[in-house]
Each structure stands twice: as structure tokens, then as C-alpha cells.
């Protein structure tokens, strides 16, 4: 259904499409099917698949996208962090940040014309592709003539990061609850565990210094500060210990996400 609705929307001339599918329900395979149908029909000949982590690109290339092997390439560094786009391929795999030049260097995506790609699929588009100030947005705006498909499990509607504004309302939604009811996903249980510094906050002793020898600002650090403004080494050990203990209690080889 997701494939049909996406292809139908594109056939109607819709240039931005959003597909929402819960984690573990087959977003990547759905992306493959969409690309396969549009590429085979000749509707889309040059395709760019964007992700934010190498493991997602590498895994996708050897698994779901394996049938594209003969005409698929990954945009990688050719030396000193410089990326090169070989125009002879048809399906391109890339990390968002690899297409945006490092400070003082030109953006690699400028090597090709704005109409080079016919189709761009943005994996995990909630991670920032729709932010006005995002580097990823530069890529999407440059290739604005291409049909752009955003795929996510968690659409955002935050100010400045609203992928509903950018891609439009989803043409298809497959929720976590639906996945559980259909038997594709296992039911889950939320276990809440709290550490004293998360609940009560933490205030350094007067004159206390950090690991770099700098004096820590004297104030109450609350939950939202921990992990951002400061890191408490002992807290990490406590978290690791509790997670390890939980895995031993429930069976350390139990399948989880």
C-alpha cells in the first residue's frame, strides 16, 4: 500500500511525499520497491538515497538494495575529505554531511547540475532535513526539481523542524500499534529507572574542578543539563551497570531494538 500510494502521488505530480512507518516495519524495503518501480518504468533515472550514518548506507547496499548493485554507487571521499560524484551511475547512496563541503571548501553536490537527480529519498527525515538552518536542507533546495520522498518513523512538528510543512501530510502511515496488532512487531514494556542526580539535580562543591582542571560553575545542574552542559562520569557507570544487570535478568540474548 505504501509503495502504491507513493507512486500514485508522484504520478499525479506531487513533488514532496512523506511516508511514515514504525521502526522495524520495512521502510528500507519499501524505499527499494518505490525506486525499483519508478526506475524500471523510466520515470526516474537518477536517484539519490540519503541517510545520516554509514552503517545505514552500507547495510542497505548489501541487503535491500543489492539488486541495484550494477548501477549503484556510494559517494565517498577521494582524499583529504573530498567527495567525488561519478555521473555514470544511476542510484547514488550518500551521507547528508558528505554532500556539504567542509569549511573553506566547495559543496560536493555542486559538481552536478541542479536537475541531475530525478528522485531523492531522505531516510529518517525527522533527523533534520526539514530544518531551515540544516546543512541537509541545502542539498534538498539545490535539487529542488527532483521528487523528494521523506521516510520516518517519527514525524516532527517542531518549530523550525516541521517535516509535515516540508513534505506535506503523509501519503501513508503505518503506526507502531498497527505493527504490533498485525504481528510484525513485538509488544513492548516501558521500564522507568531513575538515578538520584536526575531526580534531585547536582550542585558542585565550592571550588570543585572538572577533569580538565577547570572550576565548575557553582549552580544547580538539573536533568536537562546533564549530558549537555556537563557529564558525570559516575552516572555513566551507574547507567551501564543497571542496563547490564537488566540484560542478565531478562536474558542477555533477548532480541531488542
Where are these regions (language model features)?
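Interdomain helical connector at the RecA1-RecA2 junction of SF1/SF2 helicase-like NTPases
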Residues: 161-254
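ATP-dependent helicase/translocase motor core
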Residues: 1-46, 55-71, 87-91, 97, ...
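SF2 helicase catalytic motif II
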Residues: 110-150
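Short glycine-/polar-rich loops that comprise or flank the Walker A/P-loop
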Residues: 43-45, 71, 116-117, 144-147, ...
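Residues immediately C-terminal
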Residues: 56, 98, 126-127, 156-157
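Conserved catalytic network of the ASCE P-loop NTPase/AAA+ motor domain
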Residues: 40-42, 84-86, 111-114, 140-145, ...
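Structural recognition of the conserved hydrophobic beta-strand(s) that form the central parallel beta-sheet
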Residues: 92-95, 147-152
